[in-house]
C-alpha cells in the first residue's frame, strides 16, 4: 500500500483506565529538602517549587500527588500550594498515615497543645483536627485519606482493634459530610492498606463501597495482595 489517508477530525484514545495517576514524594530529606532550600530559598516546599512538580506530573500524563511530608506541611506551609495544584488540574491527597487532609507535621509541631495521637483517649481534639482539614480543602479537588495509624507512621496502640478503626472511619465520614455539606460518598476517599492496616482488612474490617482501597507493597517492592474480582466491582475499586 503506497497511500495512507486520515479523515479530518479530532481523535483521542479515550480516558485512562486508571483515574488517579501520580507521584508520592517520600524520603525527601535531606536531598530534596536541601535542594529546595538552595534553589527556592525556603525551608519548606512552596507553590513555586510545587508548580514545577505539577508541571512534571502533567507532562507524564499524571494528575495526582501525595506531597512530601517528613518535614513539610503542604497545606499549612504555603496556602497557595493547594490552590496552584487545583488551578493546574492536579489532585492532591495525603499519605497513608495522614488522614483527613492533614499533614502529620501539623500535629507534631503542636503535640504539647493537642495531646496524644490516640483516638481512644483524645477523640474530641482529633475530630476537631480532622474537621479543620476537611474545611480547608472542601473547595478544591482532593482525595481524602481516611483511617488512622499510630503517631509517627507506626502501628496504633495495643488497644486498637477493628471495632475502633470502624468507629474512626464512620466518624470521619460524618465529618466529611458535615464540613462539605454533601453526602460523604460525593467526596473521593482512599484507604491505604499498609502494613497492619491490611491485617485489619484480612480480619474483616470493611469500608463503604465508594472508598478507593490502596493496596501497598511490603516496603521491599513485593506486592502483598492484588484485588480480587469482587473488589474490582466496587465503586471505589482497589
Language-model features: locations:
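Conserved small/polar residues in nucleotide/adenosyl-binding loops
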Residues: 238
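Short, solvent-exposed loop/turn and secondary-structure capping segments
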Residues: 34-37, 69, 77-78, 97, ...
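Acidic/aromatic-lined carbohydrate-recognition and catalytic surfaces
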Residues: 73, 87-109, 116, 121
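Carbohydrate-recognition beta-sandwich/jelly-roll modules
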Residues: 1-5, 14-17, 84-88, 92
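Metallocofactor- and cofactor-centric catalytic cores in central/energy metabolism, strongly enriched
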Residues: 59, 63, 98, 140-144
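Gly/Pro-rich turn-and-neighbor structural signature
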Residues: 2-7, 69-70, 76-79, 86-87, ...
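A conserved hydrophobic secondary-structure block that centers on an alpha-helix together
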Residues: 30-33, 39-88
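Conserved, mostly hydrophobic/aromatic
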Residues: 23, 61, 213
Amino acid at each position: 500500500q503506497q497511500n495512507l489517508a486520515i479523515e479530518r477530525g479530532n481523535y483521542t484514545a479515550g480516558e485512562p483506565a486508571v483515574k488517579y495517576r501520580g507521584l508520592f514524594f517520600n524520603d525527601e530529606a535531606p536531598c530534596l529538602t536541601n535542594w529546595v532550600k538552595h534553589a527556592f530559598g525556603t525551608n519548606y516546599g512552596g507553590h513555586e517549587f510545587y508548580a514545577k512538580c505539577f508541571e512534571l506530573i502533567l507532562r507524564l500524563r499524571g494528575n495526582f500527588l501525595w506531597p512530601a511530608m517528613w518535614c513539610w506541611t503542604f497545606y499549612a506551609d504555603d496556602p497557595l500550594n493547594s490552590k496552584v495544584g487545583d488551578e493546574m488540574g492536579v489532585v492532591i491527597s495525603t499519605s497513608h498515615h495522614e488522614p483527613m487532609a492533614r499533614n502529620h507535621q501539623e500535629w507534631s509541631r503542636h503535640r504539647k497543645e493537642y495531646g496524644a495521637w490516640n483516638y481512644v483517649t483524645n477523640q474530641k481534639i482529633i475530630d476537631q483536627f480532622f474537621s479543620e482539614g476537611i474545611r480547608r480543602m472542601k473547595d478544591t479537588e482532593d482525595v481524602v485519606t481516611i483511617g488512622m495509624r499510630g503517631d509517627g507512621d507506626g502501628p496504633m496502640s495495643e488497644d486498637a482493634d477493628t471495632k475502633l478503626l470502624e468507629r474512626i472511619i464512620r466518624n470521619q465520614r460524618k465529618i466529611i459530610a458535615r464540613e462539605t455539606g454533601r453526602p460523604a460518598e460525593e467526596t473521593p476517599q482512599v484507604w491505604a492498606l499498609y502494613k497492619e492496616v491490611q491485617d485489619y482488612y484480612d480480619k474483616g474490617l470493611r469500608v463503604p463501597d465508594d472508598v478507593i482501597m490502596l493496596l501497598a507493597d511490603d516496603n521491599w517492592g513485593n506486592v502483598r495482595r492484588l484485588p480480587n474480582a469482587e473488589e474490582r466491582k466496587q465503586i471505589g475499586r482497589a
